[in-house]
Amino acid sequence: MDTSGMKIREVEAALFPADGTEVSQDLIEACRLDARQGVARLVRRYEREQAERERVAALYAYENAAADEGYELVAGVDEAGRGPLAGPVSVAAVILPRGLFLPKLNDSKKISANVREELYDEIQEKAIAVSSVLVDAKTIDRVNIYQATMNGMYEAIFGLDPAPQKVLIDAVH
């Protein structure tokens, strides 16, 4: 395959098909051999996007294993804002459709406020179920941060409708 006769927009359409079909290795190799800077930029973008897809796919490893065991409704639970000095703890439980790709998905502490907002909106729109709980500082002071977080996780899980068949918890032991 030779891409030198293609316009940059045609190369872009081939590398990033609107219908999400898989791109052939022949096309990728042909693009790598294309001397045009515009095509080189597209190849770098393609490689970045593929690396991000692989990173996010690795996050779903436990969920996929649960699905392979026959569980259809798998919830993920996590907290943010931990710390008795920092104020309340927010806990959320979410059941996402299998195979949903959320680019930029990462630990909330590792992403910007803008990305968190974008992900929040997309999760609210596409999730099968979402439940969130805010554990206040008084509760944290009364029972300790670990117990307050665990209680918040249970409350968030029991707030899901439909109820999950399996729960994956990101917790400190």
Regions from the PLM with identified roles:
Residues 81-82:
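Short active-site segment of divalent metal-dependent hydrolases/proteases
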Residues 78:
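Substrate/ligand-engaging "lid" and interaction regions
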Residues 1-75, 85-90, 94-173:
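Acidic (Asp/Glu) carboxylate-rich active-site/surface patches
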